[in-house]
């Protein structure tokens, strides 16, 4: 079997045209960037003849941000349709309405995911949250309680 292989292979060193670009995620933006590696073509009949090194990742930031580059802000949650809607429990626990003195507070429902590399942010329309509708005590002076579980057996 070895002699058949040797008859069809001349130990040629790979040239630049023996390599191709390989794009992660089919060349689509992922975390605000396109990622690409160079790899040897599948049908290339050559040897790289270099000491192995990790492939070099080429990262190209995307020009404009899309919805996939964003997550809901901390005061919002996703609904069944995937839209960010106000999380009134979270808003009640925060001091956002305390600072607004019971008035309406304006919040952006989306925030850019940390570490995202897209260049041009989307225009996000702020939502007005009426603080007077949030029934709660003032968050000032609230205590955090913890409960410790005790077990009456040995492990």
UniProtKB/Swiss-Prot annotation:
Pfam family, one: Sortilin_C
InterPro entries, alphabetized: Sortilin_C, VPS10-sortilin
UniProt protein name: Uncharacterized protein YCR099C
Organism name: Saccharomyces cerevisiae (strain ATCC 204508 / S288c)
């Amino acid at each position: 079997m070895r002699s058949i292989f040797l008859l069809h292979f001349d130990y040629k060193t790979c040239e630049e045209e023996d390599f191709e670009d390989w794009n992660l995620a089919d060349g689509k933006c992922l975390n605000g960037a396109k990622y690409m590696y160079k790899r040897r073509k599948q049908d290339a009949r050559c040897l790289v003849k270099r000491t192995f090194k990790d492939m070099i990742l080429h990262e190209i930031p995307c020009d404009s941000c899309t919805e996939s580059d964003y997550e809901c802000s901390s005061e919002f949650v996703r609904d069944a349709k995937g839209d960010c809607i106000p999380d009134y429990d979270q808003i009640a626990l925060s001091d956002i309405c305390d600072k607004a003195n019971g008035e309406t507070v304006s919040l952006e429902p989306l925030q850019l995911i940390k570490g995202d590399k897209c260049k041009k942010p989307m225009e996000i329309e702020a939502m007005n949250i009426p603080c007077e509708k949030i029934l709660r005590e003032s968050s000032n002076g609230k205590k955090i309680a913890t409960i410790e579980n005790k077990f009456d057996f040995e492990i």
